[in-house]
């Protein structure tokens, strides 16, 4: 993982266009090929990012001489720019990062992460819900448990009665962190044209009021699971709010 703290401005060029004006930011380059831009707020959420696979081309501004500058460079206001980083994904979308000054540039090999280990109840809830997917509603079907994504596995990926994709996040005690996690998964999965549109279900034995409010505000359905009933019968009880 490479962490660069720099004064930079960023332009996203693709289906939409977005611009971040010059400011001090953290640029995070992970071993999986992802690139994300962070400010000193917003908790863990990046200002902009590019999911893997993508390529990174870094060019010194001093190497350009008049007409030799690439189109990506000449299109940008580049006074005082030291480097231009061009991050491109297979669809041709780009992050164009103009570096004015680098304050810190460090790289660390974190090795392979063992991943999040769920407690026994959460793991069993996931297993039981996958076996009794109709708890989520009539006509639901299971696509896969632990559906892999670039930011971690989705507990359960399913289809509803209309065939639409539904991502399910399972917790023993559902808090705001779980809703944020589901939000990240749904945002990422909706970028996949084969899965979109993707909605979310937040399922837990107990859902905290603040988490329920946030989940519903983001369009997620909340399901309270009866663990004892799920363990003891083929058809589990639940409460929908």
From Swiss-Prot:
InterPro entries: Endonuclease_NucS (IPR002793), NucS_C (IPR048301), NucS_N (IPR048302), NucS_N_sf (IPR049173), tRNA_endonuc-like_dom_sf (IPR011856)
Gene: nucS
The organism's taxonomic lineage, starting at the top: Bacteria, Bacillati, Actinomycetota, Actinomycetes, Mycobacteriales
Protein function: Cleaves both 3' and 5' ssDNA extremities of branched DNA structures.
Cellular localization per UniProt: Cytoplasm
MF terms in GO: DNA binding; single-stranded DNA endodeoxyribonuclease activity
EC identifiers of the protein: 3.1.-.-
Alphabetic keyword roster: Cytoplasm, DNA-binding, Endonuclease, Hydrolase, Nuclease
Enzymatic class: hydrolase
PANTHER family per record: ENDONUCLEASE NUCS
Name recorded for this polypeptide: Endonuclease NucS
Gene3D superfamilies: 2.70.180.20, 3.40.1350.10
Family in the record: Belongs to the NucS endonuclease family.
Database matches in NCBIfam families: PRK03298.1
Annotated Gene Ontology cellular component terms: cytoplasm
């Amino acid at each position: 993982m490479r962490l660069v703290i720099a004064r930079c401005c960023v332009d996203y060029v693709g289906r939409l266009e977005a611009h971040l004006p010059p400011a001090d930011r953290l640029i995070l380059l992970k071993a999986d090929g992802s690139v994300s831009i962070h400010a000193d707020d917003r908790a863990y959420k990046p200002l902009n990012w590019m999911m893997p696979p993508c390529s990174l081309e870094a060019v010194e501004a001093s190497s350009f001489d008049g007409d030799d500058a690439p189109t990506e460079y000449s299109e940008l206001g580049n006074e005082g720019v030291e480097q231009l980083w061009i991050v491109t994904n297979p669809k041709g979308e780009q992050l164009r990062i103009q570096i004015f000054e680098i304050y810190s540039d460090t790289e660390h090999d974190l090795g392979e992460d063992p991943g999040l280990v769920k407690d026994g109840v959460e793991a069993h809830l996931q297993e039981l819900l996958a076996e009794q997917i109709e708890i989520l509603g009539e006509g639901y079907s299971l696509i896969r448990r632990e559906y892999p994504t670039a930011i971690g596995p989705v507990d359960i990926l399913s289809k509803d009665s209309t065939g639409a994709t539904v991502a399910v996040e399972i917790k023993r005690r559902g808090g705001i962190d779980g809703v944020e996690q589901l939000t990240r998964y749904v945002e990422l999965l909706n970028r996949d044209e084969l899965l979109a549109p993707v909605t979310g279900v937040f399922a837990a034995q107990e859902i905290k009021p603040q988490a329920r409010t946030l989940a519903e505000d983001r369009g997620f359905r909340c399901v309270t699971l009866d663990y004892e009933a799920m363990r003891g019968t083929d058809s589990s009880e639940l409460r929908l709010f």
